[in-house]
Curated annotation (Swiss-Prot):
Region (Disordered): 87-106, 172-193, 213-237
Name of encoding gene: TGIF2
Subcellular location: Nucleus
Organism field: Homo sapiens (Human)
Biological processes, Gene Ontology terms: amacrine cell differentiation; negative regulation of transcription by RNA polymerase II; nodal signaling pathway; positive regulation of amacrine cell differentiation; regulation of DNA-templated transcription; regulation of gastrulation
Protein name as annotated: Homeobox protein TGIF2
CDD domains reported in the protein's UniProt record: homeodomain (cd00086)
Keywords noted in UniProt: DNA-binding, Homeobox, Nucleus, Phosphoprotein, Transcription, Transcription regulation
Modified residues (Phosphothreonine): T182, T186
Length: 237
């Protein structure tokens, strides 16, 4: 056997010895951990503060304590529970058909975090779905005032009292009030044609009245030209 083979064998033996020494914890530390495990055998899941306290008592790191409890719950805890006449499957982490309350208690706050985080995507989806008709509804509303603006365009030109009554009647019978309650913003085409013809009559009457006022101011001796105004205003009735 060569010197290189002897060196390799010695290296393997030294590694094996280190692994064995690394896995063995001090007896006093193990006794403290065993006592804590027995006192909390029905809920053998130490909290973060308890881990720090055990770390100070045993002079071990928190990681070593976590690893020790993981192994102890699988190897030591079932025997402790059987001595008490309990079913280990109801208290250990290896159970599969246990109660939901037993699963939630050892994990601390992790189940509550899951319960809060799961509904979050559904809320986002519900908000995105509900926001679509809201935006579409807001986009449809500005289309309604256009027919109303067309009807009110000759309003500043009104000077006689008879034409003012005609415009107020036209506004009272306009279909724009019902458009805000119905989803489709398109009014009937027949109403548009009726109001367009009525609008032409109003404009002609206003233009005729203005011409008569000018003629009356230029030549006051023509009172007969002012008589046709009431006839024009009564035609739409």
């Amino acid at each position: 056997m060569s010197d290189s083979d002897l060196g390799e064998d010695e290296g393997l033996l030294s590694l094996a010895g280190k692994r064995k020494r690394r896995g063995n914890l001090p007896k006093e530390s193990v006794k403290i951990l065993r006592d804590w495990l027995y006192l909390h055998r029905y809920n053998a899941y130490p909290s973060e503060q308890e881990k720090l306290s055990l770390s100070g008592q045993t002079n071990l790191s928190v990681l070593q304590i976590c690893n020790w409890f993981i192994n102890a719950r699988r190897r030591l805890l079932p025997d402790m529970l059987r001595k008490d006449g309990k079913d280990p499957n109801q208290f250990t982490i290896s159970r599969r058909g246990g109660k939901a309350s037993d699963v939630a208690l050892p994990r601390g706050s992790s189940p509550s975090v899951l319960a809060v985080s799961v509904p979050a995507p559904t809320n986002v989806l519900s908000l995105s779905v509900c926001s679509m008709p809201l935006h579409s509804g807001q986009g449809e509303k500005p289309a309604a005032p256009f027919p109303r603006g067309e009807l009110e365009s000759p309003k500043p030109l009104v000077t006689p009292g008879s034409t003012l009554t005609l415009l107020t009647r036209a506004e009272a019978g306009s279909p724009t009030g019902g458009l805000f309650n119905t989803p489709p913003p398109t009014p009937p085409e027949q109403d548009k044609e009726d109001f367009s013809s009525f609008q032409l009559l109003v404009e002609v009457a206003l233009q005729r009245a203005a011409e008569m006022e000018l003629q009356k101011q230029q030549d006051p001796s023509l009172p007969l030209l002012h008589t046709p105004i009431p006839l024009v205003s009564e035609n739409p009735q």
